[in-house]
Regions:
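Residues forming the ATP-binding cleft of Hanks-type serine/threonine protein kinase domains
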Residues: 491
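Formylglycine-dependent sulfatase
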Residues: 2-479, 484, 494-515, 519, ...
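Short hydrophobic beta-strand that contains or immediately precedes a catalytic carboxylate
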Residues: 487-488
Length: 533
């Protein structure tokens, strides 16, 4: 049996050089859990109609600045209204810049390495091995009617799992086990519509993230035949006919876009003038310097080759042609915002917003052509890790409404925040904090695992530290000499182009951030469930 306390003591004694090793060892415990969920979750309360309704709105790959309140060029009137009536956490980050680990972190309130789910290729945890109740199950036990529409992306598995607390569960496509546990699939209920969508996107490449997927088009497929359109329409039908008047509602509406491919209904494309769209700024260098992203290119040839394809295509485009991608990305955000508005209107008509918490977030960001025409995520720079986190609704204290909170915040904070509002037991081991309470994160944490050894981020409003090992995982010894780093002063260098890590002038702040990162890892994994050997 692994002696975790000994590991933590050793890490503190040996300094930050061991922080990466600590987290890797912690990840190995991701499938060792207590025999009884009650050991860490405690008792949950029963339902009651006086509890606030919880409306959880989510997208995929939406940058922190892809909402109108942070970017006047983008049109998201419904999210902007929620921000004016709530609180926007503008320094929030995800816990991993890819779908599966980020979404599991959200649903369990735990870091990806605590769960052992660190990449999109990670296998989903089987139901008997869950560390605690996922968020929908926690709320179901607390007396909520639970309805989930759209993407969860638990991960791949060969074994069937349940709906994990969702009494109603609808998704747009089965997609090789990524959406397990649903009760309604577009594949089964609208195969012709899904086939039409797949025909339109057939040349978009894996994950719809090839060159054609990012160039995008004005879609000729009817809205409902899109996977997000199908999910939205099923959600709106449920809000008309499926609400239980005797129970509070937990509604989860989660879209696949604005993730590429960027095939968007024409009326939303027409909302934008390409002359108003900014061109993406590029760094003063052509080759990625000695960064965790450069090392990722060396070890992951799929990502490196895809970047070469994007670079070859976008470097030959005119300015207006490059802007077209950003326009389609913005239009995607506007389309989803419109669906959110329709859902909120039905909830308001049903009286469900008189006592409600409304949450909006995304799983990670999008590079959108930055750093020499890179797209998707898969790195620890702000365009990839910063996300919109927005709390609105009647339960938000009046003094917070219309405010922007610039304290560090994390995606895992949403689990304890929602649990507190719902009157159920907070997950005691969660690294997250109640965002509506007096939360006091020193910084925000994100981890990135790819083909090589991992990289870890510690971020404050002003500074960002990234530590990584430029060796394949099976070759890394995790000595201090092998650890490399990046340090950025975000206020003067928001694009993160000037690495200050080796600059002696910034040695003091570099070491302070290292200490804070190590403290966060030590405290997090010392509180992790260890199970029986």
């Amino acid at each position: 049996m692994i002696n975790y306390k000994s590991i933590i003591r050793k890490s503190i004694q040996t300094g930050v050089g061991s922080c990466i090793a600590l987290s890797i060892i912690g990840a190995s415990s991701g499938r060792i859990f207590p025999d009884k969920k009650g050991d860490i979750t405690g008792n949950v309360s029963t339902g009651g109609s006086s509890k606030p309704n919880i409306i959880f709105l989510m997208t995929d790959q939406q940058r922190w600045d892809a909402i109108g309140i942070n970017n006047p060029r983008i049109k998201t009137p419904n999210l902007d209204r929620l921000a004016r009536e709530g609180v926007l956490f503008n320094q929030a980050t995800c816990q991993a810049p890819m779908c599966t680990p980020s979404r599991n972190a959200l649903m369990f309130g735990l870091y990806p390495s605590q769960l052992g789910i660190r990449t999109n290729g990670s296998h989903a945890l089987g139901d008997p091995f869950l560390p605690c109740d996922p968020l929908p199950e926690r709320l179901r036990k607390a007396g909520y009617q639970t309805a989930g529409f759209g993407k969860t992306h638990w991960g791949r598995t060969d074994q069937p799992i349940g709906t994990r607390g969702f009494e109603t569960r609808v998704v747009g496509a089965k997609e090789v086990g990524k959406e397990i546990g649903a009760t309604h699939y577009q594949d089964d209920e609208d195969p012709e519509g899904l086939a039409a969508y797949r025909k339109e996107t057939a040349n978009y490449g894996p994950g719809e993230e090839g060159v054609a997927g990012y160039i995008g088009i004005s879609s000729e497929v009817p809205d409902r035949d899109h996977r997000d359109g199908y999910v939205a329409e099923k959600c709106l039908e449920f809000l008309d006919k499926g609400l239980d008047p005797a129970r509070p509602l937990f509604l989860y509406l989660s879209f696949l876009k604005p993730h590429a491919g960027l095939n968007v209904p024409k009326r939303f494309v027409d909302m934008y003038d390409i002359n108003d769209i900014p061109d993406t700024g590029q760094p003063p260098w052509e080759e990625e310097p000695d960064t965790h992203l450069a090392y990722c290119d060396q070890t992951n040839k799929f990502h490196a080759n895809r970047h070469k394809d994007w670079q070859a295509a976008w470097s030959k485009m005119t300015v207006l042609e490059r802007r077209r991608t950003t326009l389609h990305y913005y239009a995607n955000c506007s389309w989803l915002d419109d669906y959110f508005g329709q859902a909120l209107a039905k909830l308001e008509k049903a009286g469900r917003l008189k006592n409600a918490l409304i949450v909006f977030t995304s799983d990670h960001g999008e590079m959108l052509g930055e750093r020499n025409f890179r797209f998707t995520k898969y790195c620890l720079y702000d365009s990839s890790v910063r996300i919109p986190v927005l709390l609105s609704g009647s339960v938000v204290p009046e003094g917070l409404r219309g405010s922007i909170d610039n304290r560090p915040a994390e995606l895992v904070d949403l689990y304890p925040t929602i649990a507190k509002v719902a009157g159920t037991t907070q997950q005691l081991i969660s690294p997250g904090l109640d965002l509506l309470g007096d939360h006091k994160h020193k910084g925000s944490f994100c981890e990135f695992h790819d083909s090589g050894a991992p990289a870890y981020m510690w971020r404050t409003k002003k500074w960002k530290l990234i530590l990584f090992v430029d060796k394949p995982l099976n070759e890394a010894k995790f000595s201090a000499e092998q650890i490399k780093g990046e340090l950025y002063e975000l206020e003067s260098d928001p694009h993160e182009w000037k690495n200050l890590y080796s600059n002696k002038k910034y040695q003091k702040i570099r070491e302070q951030l290292k200490t804070e990162l190590l403290e966060n890892l030590a405290v997090t994994f010392s509180g992790f469930p260890m199970g029986k050997g």
